[in-house]
């Protein structure tokens, strides 16, 4: 799933949760999508820092 699609789905589920609520399956999906998005952000940020140089790789 592309980042744009991921964000679109996260936003859709957020809006739906505010308007009418989510099913248990949708709540699980929302949590999984958010975690996937955050992992992507962390990975990109780490790669950017490493490209600058002088940053040691640390296990998280």
UniProtKB/Swiss-Prot annotation:
What does the entry list under GO cellular component? cytoplasm
State the SUPFAM superfamilies in the record: YnzC-like
The principal location of this protein is cytoplasm
**Keywords, sorted A to Z:** Cytoplasm
Check the record and name the Pfam families matching this protein.
Answer: DUF896 (PF05979)
Subcellular localization(s) per the UniProt record: Cytoplasm
* Family to which this protein belongs: Belongs to the UPF0291 family.
Instruction: Write the protein's name.
Output: UPF0291 protein CTC_01690.1
Q: What is the lineage of its organism?
A: Bacteria, Bacillati, Bacillota, Clostridia, Eubacteriales
């Amino acid at each position: 799933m592309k980042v744009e699609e991921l964000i679109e789905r996260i936003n859709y589920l957020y809006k739906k949760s505010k308007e009418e609520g989510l099913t248990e399956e949708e709540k699980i999906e929302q949590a999984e999508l958010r975690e996937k998005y955050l992992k992507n952000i962390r990975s990109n940020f780490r790669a950017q820092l490493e490209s600058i140089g002088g940053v040691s790789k640390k296990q998280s």
